[in-house]
């Protein structure tokens, strides 16, 4: 049976309700000096949790768990076991141990009638499956169970928290409108004062921001970040905001506020490393992304090493490899990331697919790039937010450019520019303008290409994105004088020929372009400058041409092409 409340325990409970964490800790300490009870240990653990005193959190909760078991109170033991599951995940980064505690709680509750502890377990396990394993389908099942039980037993806080997990799971799976409606409802209940549990209130806001970031709905995210920051300051919820501010930094990064992003990430990293070291990886990965965009590739690599092997770190390494012209490494790392993300987790797959399309295009893996692009385009259609549609258009344009479909590339990349502008993403706008300029140059529209390169360079310079600025400048410098050509001929100066001969030997339009320039005597470096491709990509195209023509040298490829009428 629960022990009766002493004056010190009553004072501790009152202090917890007011967010007076140190006062609560002192009150529960005083109560425990008289007699050790699981209830007082629970209160002490919660105060220590908000104060980021990890050792005291674990010690108090594990003692409370043992006392509840010894007193034949399975519901109390299960409640604490759920908390311990969260603690082992958040403080120590041990998901296997965390899952063990969650399953122990489930075993303790299997013979119990519907109760608040069962709702708490379902909601927390659902969030664990979503945030740790990226599984929105199983998370939805558990969230629905938790909502039903919480409603039946009249626990509004757990019901709303369950709806928040449900909303985030729906957004993650691509049902953005439905998921956001649910999250809006939960946070309206928060604003209206329907919730009293500070943990449920804080997590509901965090899940809203997380959902906004996943679909890049940054206008909505800014509003909720501002509200959460004020709420955290009022109640002294520093650890809660330290986690969520890393997501706020992504908003700053997306919108071009790189100085603010850096300040937020440095502050979050320092706070988390002192109290929740297992959760610093996310902040380190985001800081690495900032460094990568700034062109500080060595610094980015060092930060990613510190971040370990979490999913976003894999994606960061893939992007870094791509920037270093290691398309094979980029493709492999991105594919590794995607193997960890279930297909139902559409929003988290999108970024990996975008990179796979670009890397495989550079490797001349036409089928692989096409498959990845089809999935990315499908996700963009389902999610339907402007940033994801922009990403799909950008990837489609990049792939078309790699295949020599220059006019199709132009159209896709124009759409990408427009959508990124609409989304308020200057770095992405500049990247899209760079690729659009390459497409225009391939069409020999050199004046228009130069203008797009200059616009991209101006944006990169404003952002201080040195690596991308230098790349765009190299492309601009490689443009021939405007009067060198303005007709509809190919970059080799030859008219387009009938595709029948090329199709018979399996050559793509891009490979025909490369072959004609090889015949004209251009080196791989000169070819890359003419076609605005990396030297590595040119090498892959030449290797594919020789393979398809069944020859072993460039000279033999040119001779075979002449016999087939491909150079006419």
Name each region found by the language model.
Residues 2, 35-38, 42, 71, ...:
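Residue signature of alpha-solenoid helical repeat architecture, marking inter-repeat boundaries
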Residues 60, 452, 541-544:
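Residues within the DNA-recognition helix of helix-turn-helix
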Residues 11-17, 39-54, 78-94, 117-135, ...:
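Tandem amphipathic alpha-helical repeat scaffolds
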Residues 25-33, 62-73, 86, 102-110, ...:
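Amphipathic alpha-helical segments of tetratricopeptide repeats
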Residues 21-22, 54, 74, 94-95, ...:
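TPR-repeat structural position
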Residues 24, 57, 97-98, 139, ...:
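Single-residue signature of alpha-solenoid repeat helices
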Residues 327, 358-362, 374, 398-406, ...:
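N-terminal regulatory/sensing modules of transcriptional regulators
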Residues 402, 411, 435, 477, ...:
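Helix-turn-helix DNA-binding segment
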